[in-house]
Design a protein with these regions (language model features):
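N-terminal membrane topogenic signal
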Residues: 1-8
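Short hydrophobic transmembrane-like helices used for membrane targeting/insertion
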Residues: 834-836, 946
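Flexible, low-complexity extramembrane segments of multi-pass membrane transporters/channels
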Residues: 118-121, 830, 948
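Residue-identity detector for glycine
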Residues: 827, 832, 940-943
Length: 948
């Protein structure tokens, strides 16, 4: 039985290893193709090495204990027996061979489970071995922060692992003793009722007792180590008024743990000594003292001190520790370098202010990402099998002007092919890639209410500054399945009229399929026998897999966390993706934890230390370190020297497009609402708590999202690309401040908070929304549209600082109403994405969101006009000329009829520039038109012909 079981066990292990090898080989080929083979082997050997070490330790501990048990008690007898009135009638003994088989099976299963779990902790081991100091220390134990980030997690892992191993070893040993009679359980039972009638009596031989006492000593010694580690764990306490160790923790619990360490160590020594001399009274006495120490020092004393000493004097006692919490939380979330600026709000905005901030005004965003995505899907999807996943926001220099641009990639979704065309060949060999993108400025709209497109159609037409020479997208956000390229059949490239254009992949992406063995392995890996049997493959064929952006970066560096919105960049004629990567930890001392981010894990330290770039055509991936001071990324750089590159090696054109990531900003904003209060008493009383304001989207009230904006900061000389969000006081709607994160080099990463005067009312977003609803004319017009078969969508309300004041801009879109079933199927809107498939869009016909009105508020004035220019001019009482340039003189003409022709020409040009959002030229044409009309007016009065 034993031999058969051993053979079966090792056979299962061999099958698992073989299956793992089948999966490992394609992974290695993929890493090697990207140039990250050393990274692959470091991770693989670390996983297997650490897992094997855990397995070996478990086997060693259990086998040594079983060997000792067999030597100490070689006999065989019943371990469980019950006695009736007429003697023993039931014995629950287990035969030696059966128990041996059960033990072997138990050990094999347990060792595999524990070793597998241990292998997943490989990065904790490597971070411990390669840890880099942070240069700062905690305020209680004066240990380097690196100890908490790297050493403490490893010590906790080792201690917990050993404790579990020795507890399992004790249980296995007890099972062995139960089997051979060294441990016996006897009791009485009722024959009539068949149930025990008394508590069972447990007896154990002296040798078995000594063995189990020795194991108990090891377990108690591990508990002593646990008390030592718990001292450091006090820095993550949540018991006080702030996160981290408080007065009771520092003055009582630290002392209590030191006492318990001594008591536990002494008790363990008593157990070790009595494992040889066996004085049970001494063991019971020592155990009682140890338990008493735990009850008094770990439980009772802290409760009494907290209730009778700390609570009545909480602010005085806890003040130093609240200050630690404020200081270390701000450091952990990189808020300690936030620059505070007083923002004295004015009620006036002059023509000179408009002129000074013309670039800001030209880049006011009137296109919301959500309706714009629907519009793109309607006017630029081109074919059923194309789709846009989300809309990204970036900035480009176009015609030598700094422009904020919205972009969305046109990706191919093979599941949207018609049923007859949804064949294996089409899915994996022909329809292999998306094509091009749609891009539009944030502020321009056509006369039909649609975006003016900088990049459009297939093949793409584009602005010269947004040239695209490689529009193919093999790697994107929706590329979930593998494809085969350089096969004997051509790939679909893009549609043209009634025919299609085909191509053959010319890039370096993909893993070569050189041999029958590789075909077999890939067929097994993807559970697809067609790879093995297809005749379309050639010696040059390649297979592309792991093509989705988030997965691609995550497989190479799974120890990093990734932003939820990788964004597209057009650079040097190609399409790239930039993915923000973070180093995080939940072990930063005294720092408040934040939840709900990155796989829903808690964290209390975060840095955007790495920028990842991915070539959409070749799939090349590069990791650039942008924060060289971060100890976590420095540690990973030591572990993986071939993975990371310095930021100065990033191509210069891509550097222009790095931006402050939204996920990080949202975490920082959430933290800053409370931790902007640096005064301990104010923090304790929560006197100045802020909150993120709400806004309306459509008819729903939701929390306002951070938004990108091009603007000139106060005291700065030029405009820059920022991510910003306003704040309101807790449970209030007026604005109290706003936070801005800078994206342009060399100021990338700088945070500025502008604090508004508390004694003056500055409208918050919901107050503006309420004023819109209360404005009779606007409310009536919106209601009428809603009653005439249109859905009114109120987009993002943006609070835009101009000089030392704010203007508020909210776009209004109209969309043909959907049927109720369609509306319910779309779900709730999410940032940057509208959960409407292309098939749904096709069925919706004319349901295209069109920008029809723009609401602008300034001070106590609020208007709704057909376009932003009219709205700004109306609310500010200033004609919007972003650039006051010298206008050229109008050429001489002979009579008034020619003046009329010229007036019409300038009028038409002005309309064209208005649609384009070219405020400078628009203003110039209006100025010329005004001059001509004045001449016509004066000449009409005099009745004479004019020469001008």
């Amino acid at each position: 039985m034993n031999k058969k079981l051993i053979i079966i066990g090792f056979g299962l292990i061999a099958v698992l290893l073989l299956w793992s090898g089948v999966s490992i080989y394609p992974d290695w080929l993929w890493f090697e193709n990207l140039g990250f083979s050393p990274v692959f082997w470091t991770m693989l050997l670390s996983k297997f090495g650490f897992g094997f070490l855990v397995w070996l330790l478990l086997i060693l501990i259990i086998c040594l204990n079983l060997y000792a048990a067999k030597r100490l008690n070689p006999g065989d007898g019943p371990g469980v027996a019950f006695k009736a009135a007429d003697g023993y009638v039931s014995q629950l003994g287990v035969s030696g061979r059966a128990l041996n088989s059960l033990l072997i099976a138990f050990i094999l299963i347990l060792s595999f489970v524990v070793a597998s779990k241990g292998s997943f902790q490989w990065d904790i081991l490597l971070r411990y071995l390669y840890q880099q100091p942070s240069g700062s220390t905690d305020p209680i134990f004066n240990r380097d922060i690196g100890f908490y980030l790297f050493s403490l997690p490893f010590y906790i892992l080792v201690r917990d692992g050993l404790l579990v191993l020795f507890i399992f070893a004790g249980l296995v040993t007890m099972g062995w003793y139960l089997k051979n009679g060294a441990l016996q359980i006897e009791g009485e039972f009722s024959q009539a009722e068949g149930v025990p009638t008394s508590l069972p009596k447990i007896t154990i031989t002296p040798k078995a007792k000594k063995h189990l006492i020795f194991l108990g000593g090891i377990i108690v010694l591990l508990l002593a180590w646990g008390y030592h580690l718990k001292m450091y764990g006090l820095l993550y306490s949540t018991q006080g008024p702030a996160f981290g160790a408080g007065y009771t923790d520092v003055h009582i619990k630290v002392l209590a743990y030191k006492v318990l360490i001594i008591a536990s160590t002494a008790f363990a020594l008593v157990l070790f000594v009595n494992a040889f001399r066996l004085r049970m009274k001494l063991i019971w006495l020592s155990g009682g003292i140890w338990i008493g120490a735990v009850l008094v020092f770990a439980i009772l004393l802290p409760i009494l001190i907290q209730k009778f000493v700390v609570k009545p004097n909480e602010l005085a006692k806890e003040s130093p520790y609240i200050a630690y919490n404020i200081d270390y939380t701000r450091k952990a979330y990189n808020l300690n370098r936030t620059k505070k600026v007083d923002f004295e709000v004015s009620d006036k905005l002059s023509a000179e202010d408009i002129k000074k901030h013309d670039v800001t005004i030209q880049n006011i965003r009137i296109w919301d990402e959500r309706p714009l995505l629907q519009t793109y899907r309607q006017i630029q999807t081109i074919r059923l099998y194309y789709d846009f996943n989300n809309v990204d926001v970036d900035r480009y220099l176009i015609n030598n002007q700094y422009r904020q641009v919205m972009l969305a990639t046109r990706e191919l979704v093979v599941n949207q092919l018609p049923p007859r065309a949804n064949t294996w060949v089409n899915r994996h060999l022909i329809y292999t890639h998306g094509y091009g993108l749609a891009a539009s400025p944030v502020n321009e709209v056509t006369s039909e209410g649609l975006p003016r497109l900088f990049i459009k159609d297939v093949p793409p037409s584009f602005e010269p500054d947004l040239k695209i020479e490689r529009p193919e997208i093999y790697y994107g956000e929706k590329t979930d399945q593998y494809v085969l390229v350089k096969t004997k059949t051509e790939e679909f490239d893009y549609p043209r009229g009634d025919k299609n254009v085909y191509t053959i992949y010319q890039g370096s992406g993909g893993v070569p399929i050189k041999s029958f063995l590789r075909r077999l392995l890939f067929a097994v890996e993807f559970l697809d026998p067609q790879i093995l049997f297809t005749t379309y493959l050639s010696p040059e064929s390649k297979i592309m897999y792991n093509r989705r952006i988030a997965r691609r970066a995550g497989l190479i560096a799974p120890f990093l966390d990734y932003d939820g919105d990788p964004y597209v960049v057009v650079s040097r004629g190609k399409i790239y993706w930039i993915q923000d990567a973070y180093t995080t930890s939940d072990m930063y001392p005294y720092s408040r934890r934040s939840y709900g981010h990155f796989r829903n894990k808690g964290l209390n330290y975060i840095r955007n230390s790495v920028k990842v770039t991915i070539d959409a055509y070749n799939g090349d991936v590069a990791f650039y370190i942008i924060d060289e001071k971060d100890p976590i990324v420095k540690t990973y750089s030591s572990i993986f020297p071939d993975l990371f590159k310095p930021f100065n090696e990033m191509p210069a054109d891509l550097k222009k497009h790095i931006r402050y990531p939204r996920d990080l900003f949202e975490i920082q904003v959430d933290t800053y609402t409370k931790y902007h209060m640096e005064d301990v008493q104010v923090f304790y009383n929560q006197e100045d708590l802020w909150q993120i304001p709400d806004e309306l989207y459509g008819d729903s009230r939701q929390e306002m999202e951070p938004y990108y904006i091009i603007m000139k900061l106060p005291e700065e000389e030029k405009e820059e690309f920022l991510l910003m969000l306003p704040f309101t006081p807790s449970r209030k709607d007026n604005m109290i401040g706003w936070l801005a994160a800078r994206s342009d080099l060399p100021n990338y990463g700088s945070l500025l908070v502008y604090k508004l005067p508390k004694e003056k009312l500055v409208y918050g977003p919901m107050q503006i929304e309420a004023r819109v609803d209360q404005q009779t004319d606007i409310s009536r017009e919106l209601s009428l549209w809603g009653q005439r078969g249109s859905r009114v969508i109120r987009g993002n309300l943006l609070a835009i600082p101009i000089g030392d004041t704010f203007i508020y801009v909210e776009p209004v879109y109209l969309e043909a109403k959907q049927e109720e079933s369609e509306l319910s199927s779309t779900g709730s809107p999410q940032r940057g994405a509208v959960p409407v498939s292309s098939q749904q869009d096709e069925s919706r016909g004319a349901a295209i969101p069109e920008l029809k009105r723009v609401i602008v508020a300034f001070g106590n004035r609020l208007v709704m006009e057909e376009n932003l220019d009219k709205a700004l001019s109306s609310v500010l009482d200033v004609q919007i000329f972003p650039k006051q340039l010298a206008f050229p003189s109008i050429p001489q003409i002979q009579d008034i009829s020619n003046l009329g022709v010229l007036a019409l020409e300038h009028y038409n040009k002005a309309k064209d520039y208005l649609r384009q959002g070219n405020w400078a030229e628009y203003g110039r044409e209006l100025e010329n038109l005004e001059k001509i009309l004045k001449e016509i007016s004066s000449s009409g009065k005099s009745g004479t012909s004019v020469k001008y």
